Amino acid sequence: HTFWNSSSETAHSFYVGSYGRGTAINTSDLDVLIELPDDEFSHFSSIYGNGQSRLLQSVKNALLLTYPNTNIKGDGQVVVVKFSDGMKFEILPAFRNNTIWGWDGTYKYPDTHMGGDWMTTNPKAEQEAMKEKNSSSNGLLFDACKHVRYVRDNNFSSYHLSGILVDAFLYDAIGGWHFLREGEQHSGGRVHGLKMKTK
């Protein structure tokens, strides 16, 4: 509302992270990319001394207008919103990367570490790639990502293995798998259960 003078809650935002990729489980944070107007980028990128941190504070203050009794703080690249019911949102403020040919599909977002910088992401391409590989693996990619998250959260939470790392590893690993027919052999002998092999 503050940045676009709009009453829409979805016109300039979409899910990213594990929810956007389709690999979230019930313990996952909700990551939301909020697209901000270009003139805001011009303003914050011209600020001397970590304009990225000032941007996160500005987004935090805008959220506090709507949720004044909620725990909201800037954290590196996002604004973290923790509700009393346990729901946790990570808000990523971002700007379209426009070239002389128009928008290239990527976004720049703030990183407040080391004095501040701008990073680039392409979440829609990432989401499409995940959907395509999940489809070609008959749903195995999303199921495997969710299962590894469950095991991580219940047995190895001290390792702090990020969701993007889980997804990237499994995305790459599943690329070399293919399904076997019942009774078909692979070089290591009979496959039980999953009926798949690596190339």
Regions found by a protein language model. Name each.
Residues 1-14, 145:
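Helical scaffold of the NTase/Pol beta-like nucleotidyltransferase catalytic core
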Residues 1-6, 34-81:
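Metal-dependent nucleotidyltransferase catalytic core
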Residues 10-17, 70-73:
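A short acidic/basic microdomain associated with nuclease active sites
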Residues 18-23, 91-93:
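Amphipathic, interaction-prone secondary-structure segments
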Residues 21-27, 82:
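Short glycine-biased active-site loop of nucleotidyltransferases that positions the nucleotide triphosphate
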Residues 25-26, 43-46, 102-103:
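Short, solvent-exposed loop/turn and secondary-structure capping segments
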Residues 60, 67-198:
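Catalytic cores of NTP-dependent nucleotidyl/adenyl transfer enzymes across multiple folds
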